[in-house]
Amino acid sequence: MLRQNLLDQLKHFIETVSNGHSCPQLLTSPNLIKLALGFLEELPATRDIVFEYFALLAEISVQLYVSPEMADPKTGMPVSQVKLAGNRQQQQRAPEYEAFNLVKTALQSLVWKGPPAWSPLIANWSLELVAKLSDKYTQRRMTITASCNYWLECSAMHGLMTLINSCFRKLTQPEEEACVEIMLNAFHRFPMTFDWIVARLGGCFPYKIIMQILQCGIKRFVDDYRCHLDSEAGILDYMTSCHEQHLRAAFREMLREGFAPKKPLDVAVVPFLLITTNYSDTILQSLVNVLVEIYTEDMCEVIVQKAPLWLSNKMFAGMQPTLNNAVLRLNERGATLLLTAAKMAEKYVWCQDFLDNSMQELEQWVLNQRNFPLLADLAYEETKYMLWKSCLSTNLFEQQTAVRLLLVVSSQHPNIYYQTISQLLKKSYAQNPNGIGALIRLLGGQSGMVNFPGFTPGFKMVLEDITLDVQVNNRLPVPPGTPTEAFNTFSNLNILARMHKSKNVAPYIKAQHLNQALNECLPKILQIFDCTVNKLVLRIDRDAAERIADKFRAQQSKNSNNNNELCNGKDYGKRTKLEPGEDKVDDEDATRMRLAHLIVDLLNNIEAGSRTTVLRTPLVLKLATLSVKYFFVGLTEKTVIRRAAASHRSYTLLQRQCSARKIARTVCLRELVERALFYHGHLLGQLEVYQLDELEIPEHEHLILQNLHTSSGANSNRSVLHSGIIGRGLRPVLPPSERNCDAEKQALYLKALNACCADLEKPNNVEGYSLVSLLLVELVSTDVMYNGLPFPDEEFTRVTMERDMLIRRAFINSPVLWAVLGLIAGHRPALCYSSVLLRALCATCLHHWRGKNVNRFQPTAANDELMLCTKKMLQLLAMSQLIPPPLTNLHLIIEHFESAEIALLLRECIWNYLKDHVPSPALFHVDNNGLHWRNTNTQLAKVPPQYVDPLRHLMQRKLSTLGPHYHQMFIMGELMEGDSEPDPTARLQIVEID
């Protein structure tokens, strides 16, 4: 009975399906669907009929999906039936559209819960059905992504794809191979419409599908090289999004076969892969990634050997323009590919052609302001560092390629341009001089671009980094002698500045732009210069203090009778010959010194402080102060040549500033004089005085312990009147000063003063020297009163005796004062403004010679300090024409007179003459050459006899000794009276007082 019932139901099912083609409502009846599903379990022989019915249901659903009524009137895209609610006809079609969902649910349950044999059967049926429906109802060619989005919106197609995916998970290895074969066969039959199915289902067997697709493409390519590979490329492109590693593995395997061909198809592997990259940027990117990973130098030789085989393919022979364009489509490894080709360009001409074509097209895209994927690759941090490294390469092709790529990316990312300038400026090009060419080419910018970023921010960036590095004293430890980044930067900037001055950078860098950029960075340069020079100055002062302290301790040890008590049984305060870390300090100081020299060279090359540059007043003052500090730092160089070189650098810097601005001249002169007298006098032979702490009380010593050093002795004159220190013993006997007046350093110092005072436009201008004279009065004289030009009566010197003695002490301690006065004396009438100093010297010498008259038999040594002071003073007066002939020769014969006679001459001849003839600039007139001159040979300027007769009478007593001088001074002078006034033709610029 049950058997008969099944047969009746089968008959009814066949009749209904046969007669229901014109009535979809009848075919999509839920009862009929349930009846068909029952046949699968109860009547396996009806399986083919049932699956045909299921295919019919799927086709009905697809027909409803692609019908015009299912299209959105606004977008034209199909709309899911279940989402429609306004159209009655569409509402009636909804059950038919969703009918296949019942089939999908039942078949999926059968796959998961039924026998394993159902999985391959349902999978094969679903693949065939999807292929037929897709091919039949595809109305236009679409991309794989668009096809997936289009068909997966259809309920039936989505259900079939779900079934296939479920079946694939239950298949065994042989069954998988069979399903893949069916899928590829369907792809061969429907290559234009089945590609999206392969791409969608390829995730189940990614590597197999990818390899099979590639093999199919190679076969088609070998049969017809003009064939289109859109489907194959589309499948690979779609699968790359989730299975890129499998695609790379497939490419790696195929390239291995292509570079070592064993089969006829292997020869076409490389041309096929390169052709495939034209269809998809994703495939191109994956292939390039694989090539970069497996590339070796040996592979290059293989490529050259196999190239004739590949060129036999007509399409590959003419695809170089396509390859050039391919580089611009890379999101990654594009720069690596170009640099690799650049490294090979020296050996292979085709690499040069590839580079030229690629870079020209790349730059053309930039000029046209077109965006391309390679820009993203160039902007990556890793790529940026790789390009910076290539800029330092000795391979010129690699270097210039890296520079051009950096210029390309800099047009869109200015920060990379600034960072690149900063990095290249910090590098040393001593071993690779051609490396500076990359920096020069980079500063030239991208030709043809109007709004290309300037390089001034790049200079400021590197100077900011150097400022931090200099301030923290080299954050990273470096081996001794290694050039620092600061040294390299200023060395490179000097090279650029010198090229700018010699007009050798014209093809690349606009000279005015370079000079303007460096002058804009002047505040940063001065900040670095300030930090560097100040550290050197501190080191100089510290060394001087330690040297003085060592000398004092050594003498103290010799003079003390109780050395052990003084030092508390220890070598207190003594330094070892080489303290730990002293070598490191010396290396750091040497590095700073070299850096200071480079900075000054740069300032001279860019003509910092000249009239053509506009500087704010604080910068002018800072530059002037640092220039003077650098001069004194340069005097500490170890050799004469280095000192001279440093001094000449400072002369150029000082002279340019002082000629341009009066405020700079004032500051420079004040700093030069003040530092020579109070801060760095030890460099110029100044007497070094140790600041002695006589009590030497320890900082944490209690008062009760301090009192133990003292005791109450007998109240006698021998215990009360003593020359020692209570509790410390006798004062040490200091040795006589052993001053070494370095003539070389004094000459350099005088040249520095002369550089500040000299006016190139007005050579005879003495304004600067007059300013030095006034500064000496301000800094040496301790009293603001009685600093005028006139000489008072000799009795008045008792009022200013203390000040005069202090001024005399200043000349004793600082011998350079004599040299400075000698320089001033040669530029008349500047010495007149130092009248108070001359008055103090004359007064003290007069009183001292008068005091020596107490013991008239005491001989005067030739090098006695008083005699030397007197001779120098008289020589200054003669050079400056403040005293007339024959008194101008007095310094030559003064040593032949006794103390009383010298005192007489100083009072009657010198002091009285200067008292009656005030040393004023009004005494001098300007001759035709612009020189200030005092004519003393005319009748009106004849010296009255009261100033000359004392000298005449004293010389007459000693004619045996002073006869030649007497003849020259008096007899010859009287014979020459009435002659024309002398015509001075030269002037002493630097005069050293003997």
Swiss-Prot record:
It is found in: Nucleus membrane; Nucleus; Cytoplasm. GO terms for biological process: negative regulation of BMP signaling pathway; positive regulation of gene expression; positive regulation of neuron differentiation; RNA polymerase II transcription initiation surveillance; snRNA 3'-end processing. Disulfide bonds: none annotated. Keywords: Cytoplasm, Membrane, Nucleus, Transmembrane, Transmembrane helix. Pfam families: INTS5_C, INTS5_N. It comes from the Eukaryota. The chain crosses the membrane at residues 769-786, 810-826. InterPro entries: INTS5, INTS5_C, INTS5_N. Residues 559-586 are annotated as: Disordered. GO terms for cellular component: cytoplasm; cytosol; INTAC complex; integrator complex; nuclear membrane; nucleus. One of its GO terms (molecular function) is DNA binding. It is a multi-pass membrane protein. The keyword Nucleotide-binding does not apply. Residues 571-583 have a biased composition (Basic and acidic residues). Component of the integrator complex, a multiprotein complex that terminates RNA polymerase II (Pol II) transcription in the promoter-proximal region of genes. The integrator complex provides a quality checkpoint during transcription elongation by driving premature transcription termination of transcripts that are unfavorably configured for transcriptional elongation: the complex terminates transcription by (1) catalyzing dephosphorylation of the C-terminal domain (CTD) of Pol II subunit Polr2A/Rbp1 and Spt5, and (2) degrading the exiting nascent RNA transcript via endonuclease activity. Belongs to the multiprotein complex Integrator, at least composed of IntS1, IntS2, IntS3, IntS4, omd/IntS5, IntS6, defl/IntS7, IntS8, IntS9, IntS10, IntS11, IntS12, asun/IntS13, IntS14 and IntS15. The core complex associates with protein phosphatase 2A subunits mts/PP2A and Pp2A-29B, to form the Integrator-PP2A (INTAC) complex. Belongs to the Integrator subunit 5 family. This is Integrator complex subunit 5. It comes from Drosophila melanogaster.
